[in-house]
Amino acid sequence: MEKWWFNSMLSNEELEHKCGLSKSADSLGPIGNASGSETPIINGIDKNIHSWSDNGSYSCSNVDHLFGVRDIWSFISDDTFLVRDSNGDSYSVYFDIENQIFEIHNDSYFLSELESAFSSYLNKRSFSSYLNSGPKSYNRNYDRYMYDTQYSWNNHINSCIDSYLHSEISIDSDIYSYICSESLSGSDSESSSIRTSINGSDFDINTKYGRLWVQCENCYGLNYQKFFRSKMNICERCGYYLKMSSSDRIELSIDPGTWDPMDEDMISMDPIEFHSEEEPYRDRIDFFQRTTGLTEAVQTGIGQLNGIPIAIGVMDFQFMGGSMGSVVGEKITRLIECATNRSLPVIIVCASGGARMQEGSLSLMQMAKISSALYNYQSNKKLFYVSILTSPTTGGVTASFGMLGDIIIAEPNAYIAFAGKRVIEQTLKKTIPEGSQAAEYLFHKGLFDLIVPRNPLKGVPSELFQLHGFFPLNQINKYK
């Protein structure tokens, strides 16, 4: 339903936008509800702005019994819109910015009287001004309906609304979201559509629209959340690979119904009692556990990949940057030991900022512990380990199990490094070329075996496993 928006404020000098009419303690009570009750009705409003009427003519009868012209000042506020849809039905739209209240009422009788009151007031002020000052000094601001063209009036309303949106409604409100996000469809003329611009300082797409849209980190285009997972978190506009959660990667890689997680109840206990002036370590752990639904920065377990039993660990960058603490190291070590005992191939998907500083040397020790378990797995048991490096893989993970795979696979354009660019530049006092820590550049230097896009990422390890003697269970049972 297309809705039409009228916003104006009556002042001594001119007719200015200040969002129409509102509640009054001295008059009728809540606008659009003469009974005095307040029943919120949630609805939306379009951002196509028109004048209140196409012809600009109004009747001013049957008004005095509601309120006189002098009483109209008590109705002026910043909080109410007069709205008319394409069917001619009228509404009053009230919202309180501070308390984020949004109400709509469609009492047609009251609104018709309200509309007439405005017309009556404008006509009386214009006529009085004409008599007192004469034709030459007559202020036409008070009679835009009678003398201004429709185009001029629309432009006036557009500029007022545009100014108001930028100056007043910079809050986390569904009203502002709806106005700024709805398309221009339904607008009959260019002059009647409001033009708004949004900058990152007061309008965060990810915060306000996270449940609907995902913003690309590269081109800043919006991807519809409903289809984003089915496209494996790849931007539709530029093809950029956005981060995936560990749960999404498990769903992508593991056959349905075969996932058996390990050590889900293992959590960090702040072993060195790390304290920060900003936020205690335990509070940070609790926060990320609530926001991600995970207990730690890695998920480990046993599953099947195209029918082949495997042991897999998937790191999650959303949990404290995927940092490796004592729990992460212990879970990965136990996974490798389980795979060693059961002669299973291992996949570890890396996405980490490195060792967790809140656990000091205990986090650094995990590098040696995991590497020791991998040495026994690879060298003594002659089993097969595939390392998959995603963006970002840095620090202690790069310096340990990330680069120890029998086959090392990287995602396209993944950021892979030991130290970050700023650290290197500040330490060596040299400028690091752009792209020198990207997967493609490092691949040509011989650091990886493969760069594999996400679409075939499940099939490639499956073929590698079969090449190394790991076959699907149905084929093993077939030959028995």
Curated annotation (Swiss-Prot):
Binds 1 zinc ion per subunit. GO terms for biological process: fatty acid biosynthetic process; malonyl-CoA biosynthetic process. Zn(2+) binds at residues 216, 219, 235, 238. GO terms for molecular function: acetyl-CoA carboxylase activity; ATP binding; carboxyl- or carbamoyltransferase activity; zinc ion binding. InterPro entries: AcCoA_carboxyl_beta (IPR034733), Acetyl_CoA_COase_Trfase_b_su (IPR000438), ClpP/crotonase-like_dom_sf (IPR029045), COA_CT_N (IPR011762). Residues 212-480 form the CoA carboxyltransferase N-terminal domain. Pathway: Lipid metabolism; malonyl-CoA biosynthesis; malonyl-CoA from acetyl-CoA: step 1/1. One of its GO terms (cellular component) is acetyl-CoA carboxylase complex. Acetyl-CoA carboxylase is a heterohexamer composed of biotin carboxyl carrier protein, biotin carboxylase and 2 subunits each of ACCase subunit alpha and ACCase plastid-coded subunit beta (accD). It comes from the Eukaryota. The keyword Transferase applies. A zinc finger (C4-type) spans 216-238. Belongs to the AccD/PCCB family. This is Acetyl-coenzyme A carboxylase carboxyl transferase subunit beta, chloroplastic.
